[in-house]
Amino acid sequence: MRCLPVFVILLLLIASAPSVDAQLKTKDDVPLASFHDNAKGTQHKRIINWCCLIFYQCC
């Protein structure tokens, strides 16, 4: 029972914390979509290379 007030206070603090989106953008900011696209492209290339090395059918 002693932990309940602490738990409620922590929930209120978390809910009132500013989100990442609330930060001001600068000219150097890059959209996250480009990072995700680059990661997907790199992952796809690795899968194709692995497939070519193992099975020789994907090339």
From Swiss-Prot:
GO terms for cellular component: extracellular region. Residues 1-22 form the signal peptide. The keyword S-adenosyl-L-methionine does not apply. The keyword Transport does not apply. InterPro entries: T-conotoxin. Residues 23-44 form a propeptide. GO terms for molecular function: sodium channel regulator activity; toxin activity. Disulfide bonds join 51-58, 52-59. Keywords: Cleavage on pair of basic residues, Disulfide bond, Ion channel impairing toxin, Neurotoxin, Secreted, Signal, Toxin, Voltage-gated sodium channel impairing toxin. Expressed by the venom duct. Belongs to the conotoxin T superfamily. Negative results: shows very weak inhibition of neuronal sodium channels rNav1.6/SCN8A (14% inhibition at 200 nM), and rNav1.7/SCN9A (7%). The cysteine framework is V (CC-CC). This is Mu-conotoxin SrVA.
